[in-house]
């Protein structure tokens, strides 16, 4: 990727990651780009612990509509969330579990407020499987152990960022789309970030940062 296009968000991987961590600490979203040879997409990511209905509404409005809750394997086991399919043959092995809905406190489950309630229910310290109904309107994703050092995906990036910011290891993500419904690529993501004031970093930035600091 041409790094100069990302210079408004930091001249080095370290700067971009630190800016993103700081944004997360303040409960703000960040935009994460993956490799151009992979999905070549940008996801808007919020810490699950602090996401608001207003932020969820932005994900729904500007994203693909598939809002995902990225969580650890340990959390998936705590909630008894099996994989969506027995044999995952998707290109990037995206680890969807069955979809979820909060058992209490929601109406249809599809509104921004309802999806936030579902997320808050799922990441509660004392959450148990019966706190959730299946299926639902939130799509959990199981992050690979080791984060982006194991798998260079948006799922792992969101969990890593949450951990580095001092939050529970859970992030809420959605792919950003253009007004015509096509996927937003790097130039589109940069313009989107400038318009709304988001930090931008790449998954490779996060890999480089973690390796440099052994974290």
Curated annotation (Swiss-Prot):
<comment type="pathway">
    <text>Cofactor biosynthesis; riboflavin biosynthesis; 2-hydroxy-3-oxobutyl phosphate from D-ribulose 5-phosphate: step 1/1.</text>
</comment>
<dbReference type="GO" id="GO:0005829">
    <property type="term" value="C:cytosol"/>
</dbReference>
<comment type="function">
    <text>Catalyzes the conversion of D-ribulose 5-phosphate to formate and 3,4-dihydroxy-2-butanone 4-phosphate.</text>
</comment>
<dbReference type="GO" id="GO:0009231">
    <property type="term" value="P:riboflavin biosynthetic process"/>
</dbReference>
<feature type="binding site">
    <location>
        <position position="43"/>
    </location>
    <ligand>
        <name>D-ribulose 5-phosphate</name>
    </ligand>
</feature>
<keyword id="KW-0479">Metal-binding</keyword>
<feature type="binding site">
    <location>
        <begin position="38"/>
        <end position="39"/>
    </location>
    <ligand>
        <name>D-ribulose 5-phosphate</name>
    </ligand>
</feature>
<keyword id="KW-0456">Lyase</keyword>
<comment type="similarity">
    <text>Belongs to the DHBP synthase family.</text>
</comment>
<feature type="site" description="Essential for catalytic activity">
    <location>
        <position position="175"/>
    </location>
</feature>
<dbReference type="GO" id="GO:0030145">
    <property type="term" value="F:manganese ion binding"/>
</dbReference>
<feature type="binding site">
    <location>
        <position position="39"/>
    </location>
    <ligand>
        <name>Mg(2+) 1</name>
    </ligand>
</feature>
<feature type="binding site">
    <location>
        <position position="175"/>
    </location>
    <ligand>
        <name>D-ribulose 5-phosphate</name>
    </ligand>
</feature>
<protein>
    <recommendedName>
        <fullName>3,4-dihydroxy-2-butanone 4-phosphate synthase</fullName>
        <ecNumber>4.1.99.12</ecNumber>
    </recommendedName>
</protein>
<dbReference type="InterPro" id="IPR017945">
    <property type="entry name" value="DHBP_synth_RibB-like_a/b_dom"/>
</dbReference>
<keyword id="KW-0460">Magnesium</keyword>
<feature type="binding site">
    <location>
        <position position="39"/>
    </location>
    <ligand>
        <name>Mg(2+) 2</name>
    </ligand>
</feature>
<feature type="binding site">
    <location>
        <begin position="151"/>
        <end position="155"/>
    </location>
    <ligand>
        <name>D-ribulose 5-phosphate</name>
    </ligand>
</feature>
<dbReference type="Pfam" id="PF00926">
    <property type="entry name" value="DHBP_synthase"/>
</dbReference>
<feature type="binding site">
    <location>
        <position position="154"/>
    </location>
    <ligand>
        <name>Mg(2+) 2</name>
    </ligand>
</feature>
<keyword id="KW-0464">Manganese</keyword>
<dbReference type="InterPro" id="IPR000422">
    <property type="entry name" value="DHBP_synthase_RibB"/>
</dbReference>
<dbReference type="GO" id="GO:0000287">
    <property type="term" value="F:magnesium ion binding"/>
</dbReference>
<dbReference type="GO" id="GO:0008686">
    <property type="term" value="F:3,4-dihydroxy-2-butanone-4-phosphate synthase activity"/>
</dbReference>
<feature type="site" description="Essential for catalytic activity">
    <location>
        <position position="137"/>
    </location>
</feature>
<keyword id="KW-0686">Riboflavin biosynthesis</keyword>
<comment type="subunit">
    <text>Homodimer.</text>
</comment>
